[in-house]
């Protein structure tokens, strides 16, 4: 617990100026187009809560991704000070939210150590948010303030009482700043996992309301536990080596944890003051130097180099190594604003000295583990030598082939890699269609026979001797392995995996992705790998055939068919609503139903569909008990009418004591088991609810007694819009035959070009890695040697599978 317990407006130091943020957001938060800036918004808010935890006042943080892509971050810290700031004349909370570089971390006494990726504070998040709602629980009171684009809508005000404490920030990023507002679970989970390991004992709950997924990140044991986590499902060669030292001579703190495993991949993570360095830097250089020197000294001292007649390198030492280097530096220097590379020269000396000292002691004190590590290093050197010989053999064979390219490859005429595409296709039949259907100028085709080697289980020299892998490496042209690999020699910057939509196709795609992830991850990082998306359906109507790409396009096609020659009549005598007007109404209805489906993990659709037909509830109405009671009676009447055998609904009002609101709550009793759903203030304030009530107003004024729909000569009386739409859809599908489509070989060359290869109409998925640690574990679990973790994975995820097609 911190010694200075006074945390009020006097702790908040101000460095002014916020206008520049809206003009040049990239300087403050990162790229606003590729998602990095968007996710930094969350990290800036979370870092404030982490600072509270480091000071000893916060133990729980929750992050919620809402269905409308807004975010709530809540902690149980002290709560931001609410008293009036002497310099600024407004509440300290408003200063923190509206002034750049204002906060406790600029006052040396409040936070001794603080995170912060860009160190710009939550005010930048506020400036770049369409709306931000700040809720503070402090001194048994609840305070609230709302901002639009950083502008306060009213002064901080007291809204209720509470027993808890802490800060809650709910924000919706501004579409004026960010071109794509979609939060990635993987990107958030990656950083939160790092923070929870680097800050032992703090529980961080990540919850995604879009999918229902949630995970608690809470780890004791710091970096040692982090290494053990990274090596899950791998066989460890040694116990985790770990040290943590604070140097007095230069004030640098060095913590290292490492462990070798039986895989062939190196996994090194570097941090400075809790911030990750993707490109390493001086701390990594110092670590590598000390590691290689110590191991080579040990090999020399034991006489192993002469015995095995082999020379080892630093690369051999790092095969199968998982290590984390974390340094605490008073004033770190980085190569750029994004802090991806540390350049402080004194850190190299610090890490090299401490690592050299502690690791030498480890090798001397643990002779059995030292022998196991060195044995693995010598095995790696032997495999490297075997791989070199295999490469030379491949080269000699290749010299006989024209230009050294595999005979199977149908190359393209274009020599600029940025304009060239390589289609990796499954089998010769699809390869034949693809070769005939392609654009020869820019599209090359490489058919692979059967399933390529699973590189997760194979050593490097065995992998090189595999014919299909060798063919692929030669076609790509960039080489493989540390000595040979050169991304600049890659012959295609668009590598497209095109396999059938069946089990074998999925397996081949997974084997190829395993190869790229393990051997050429840079191709994925640069966005060169794609997966082709052939159409899912073929629809026949009379003599007409049409390919349809996915379920959404199928629904659109069937809706068009249903609305042909169709009309909706408000009553018996009214003219019909048809054509574009009817299509617009159907699309609006479908949009609302899609919204309700998206919300259904939180609020069951069987309840929310009634809101279309009920009066609109405003946020102000929630404070009026009698108004809410009247609305509830109408809601209960509809629920009672919808009850089925074994299922009953009971609606009531629940008081929110913090804010003095009356919230509708429904008890669902299914076969004697009760579950409860509460519709909270955020639900009624959301754009989603607004769209439901607007559609309701439109539909409720539309249908009268005697309403009907008509298609051609056929009529159907209706009492609800849904009944009419369902009847029209059923009528529209009658004369269609629908074929679910699986194999590429089923298409002729012309169809393959039109649907899957023509750059003007095709759809492709770009392969990305947003959470490398999670990706590593998935590949290890699904493609590795251990069977038990794979069975556990399948059992725990089986129920989440949709569209299982085997």
From Swiss-Prot:
The keyword Cytoplasm applies. Mg(2+) 1 binds at residues 426, 500. Its EC number is 5.6.2.2. The keyword tRNA-binding does not apply. GO terms for cellular component: chromosome; cytoplasm. Pfam families: DNA_gyraseB (PF00204), DNA_gyraseB_C (PF00986), GyrB_hook (PF21249), GyrB_insert (PF18053), HATPase_c (PF02518), Toprim (PF01751). Its cofactor is Mg(2+); Mn(2+); Ca(2+). Its main location: cytoplasm. It comes from the Bacteria. Disulfide bonds: none annotated. One of its GO terms (molecular function) is DNA binding. Binds two Mg(2+) per subunit. The magnesium ions form salt bridges with both the protein and the DNA. Can also accept other divalent metal cations, such as Mn(2+) or Ca(2+). It is found in: Cytoplasm. GO terms for biological process: DNA topological change; DNA-templated DNA replication. Heterotetramer, composed of two GyrA and two GyrB chains. In the heterotetramer, GyrA contains the active site tyrosine that forms a transient covalent intermediate with DNA, while GyrB binds cofactors and catalyzes ATP hydrolysis. Belongs to the type II topoisomerase GyrB family. Few gyrases are as efficient as E.coli at forming negative supercoils. Not all organisms have 2 type II topoisomerases; in organisms with a single type II topoisomerase this enzyme also has to decatenate newly replicated chromosomes. This is DNA gyrase subunit B. It comes from Pseudomonas aeruginosa (strain ATCC 15692 / DSM 22644 / CIP 104116 / JCM 14847 / LMG 12228 / 1C / PRS 101 / PAO1).
């Amino acid at each position: 617990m911190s010694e200075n317990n006074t945390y009020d407006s006097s702790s908040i130091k101000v460095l002014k100026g916020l206008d520049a943020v809206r003009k040049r957001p990239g300087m403050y938060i990162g790229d606003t187009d590729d998602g990095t800036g968007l996710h930094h918004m969350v990290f800036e808010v979370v870092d404030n809560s982490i600072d509270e935890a480091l000071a000893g006042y916060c133990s729980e943080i929750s992050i919620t991704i809402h269905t409308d892509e807004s975010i709530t971050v809540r902690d149980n810290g002290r709560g931001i000070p609410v008293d009036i700031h002497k310099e600024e004349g407004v509440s300290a909370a408003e200063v923190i939210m509206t002034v750049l570089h204002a906060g406790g971390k600029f006052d040396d006494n409040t936070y001794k150590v603080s995170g912060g990726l860009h160190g710009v504070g939550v005010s930048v998040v506020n400036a770049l948010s369409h709306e931000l709602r700040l809720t503070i629980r402090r001194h048994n009171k609840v305070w609230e303030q709302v901002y639009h684009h950083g502008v306060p809508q009213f002064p901080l005000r007291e809204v209720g009482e509470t027993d808890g404490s802490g800060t809650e920030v709910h924000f919706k990023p501004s579409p004026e700043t960010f071109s794509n507002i979609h939060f990635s679970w993987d990107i958030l989970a990656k950083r939160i996992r790092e923070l929870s390991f680097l800050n032992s004992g703090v529980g961080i709950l990540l919850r995604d309301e879009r999918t229902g997924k949630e995970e608690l990140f809470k780890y004791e044991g710091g970096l040692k536990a982090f290494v053990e986590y990274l090596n899950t499902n791998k066989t460890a060669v040694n116990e985790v080596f770990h040290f943590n030292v604070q140097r007095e001579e230069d004030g640098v703190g060095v913590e290292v944890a490492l462990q070798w495993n039986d895989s062939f991949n190196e996994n090194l993570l570097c941090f400075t003051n809790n911030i990750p360095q993707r490109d390493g830097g001086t701390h990594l250089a110092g670590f590598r130097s000390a590691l290689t020197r110590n191991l080579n000294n040990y090999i020399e001292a034991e006489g192993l180099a002469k015995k095995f007649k082999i020379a080892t390198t630093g690369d051999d030492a790092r095969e199968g190594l998982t290590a984390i280097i974390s340094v605490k530096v008073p004033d770190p220097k980085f190569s750029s604003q994004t802090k991806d590379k540390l350049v402080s020269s004194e850190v190299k000396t610090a890490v090299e000295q401490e690592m050299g000292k502690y690791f030498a002691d480890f090798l001397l004190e643990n002779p059995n583990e030292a022998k196991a590590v060195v044995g693995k290093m010598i095995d790696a050197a032997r495999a490297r030598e075997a791989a070199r010989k295999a490469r030379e053999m491949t080269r000699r064979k290749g010299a006989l082939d024209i230009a050294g390219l595999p005979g199977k490859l149908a190359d393209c005429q274009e020599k600029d890699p940025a304009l060239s595409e390589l289609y990796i296709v499954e089998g010769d039949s699809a390869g034949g269609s693809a070769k005939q259907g392609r654009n020869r100028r820019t599209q090359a085709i490489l058919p692979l026979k059967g399933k390529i080697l699973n590189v997760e289980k194979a050593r490097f020299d065995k992998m090189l001797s595999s014919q299909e892998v060798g063919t692929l490496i030669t076609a790509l042209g960039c080489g493989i392995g540390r000595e040979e690999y050169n991304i600049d020699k890659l012959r295609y910057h668009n590598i497209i995996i095109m396999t059938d939509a069946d089990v074998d196709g999925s397996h081949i795609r997974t084997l190829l992705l395993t190869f790229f992830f393990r051997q050429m991850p840079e191709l994925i990082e640069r966005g060169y790998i794609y997966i082709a998306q052939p159409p899912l359906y073929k629809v026949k109507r009379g003599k007409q055939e049409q390919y349809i790409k996915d379920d959404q396009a199928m629904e659109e096609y069937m809706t068009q068919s249903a609305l042909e020659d169709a009309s909706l009549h408000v009553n018996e005598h009214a003219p019909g609503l048809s054509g574009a007007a009817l299509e617009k109404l159907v699309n609006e209805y479908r949009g609302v139903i899609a919204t309700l489906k998206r919300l259904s993990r939180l609020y069951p659709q069987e309840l929310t569909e009634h809101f279309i037909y009920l009066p609109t509830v405003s946020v102000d109405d929630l404070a009026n008990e009698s108004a809410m009671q009247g609305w509830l009676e109408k809601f209960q009447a509809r629920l009672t009418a919808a009850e089925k055998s074994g299922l009953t609904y009971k609606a009531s009002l629940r008081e929110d004591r913090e804010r003095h609101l009356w919230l509708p709550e429904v008890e669902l009793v299914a076969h004697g088991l009760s579950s409860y759903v509460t519709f909270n203030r955020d639900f009624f304030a959301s754009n989603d609810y607004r769209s439901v009530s607007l559609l309701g107003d439109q539909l409720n004024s539309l249908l009268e007694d005697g309403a009907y729909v008509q298609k051609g000569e056929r009529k159907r009386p209706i009492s609800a819009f849904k009944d009419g739409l369902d009847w029209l859809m059923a009528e529209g599908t009658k004369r269609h035959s629908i074929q679910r489509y699986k194999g590429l070989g089923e298409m002729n060359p012309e169809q393959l070009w039109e649907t899957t290869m023509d750059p003007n109409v095709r759809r492709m998925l770009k392969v990305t890695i947003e959470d490398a640690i999670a990706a590593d574990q998935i590949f290890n679990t699904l493609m590795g040697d251990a069977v038990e973790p794979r069975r556990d994975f399948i059992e725990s995820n089986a129920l989440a599978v949709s569209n299982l097609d085997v």
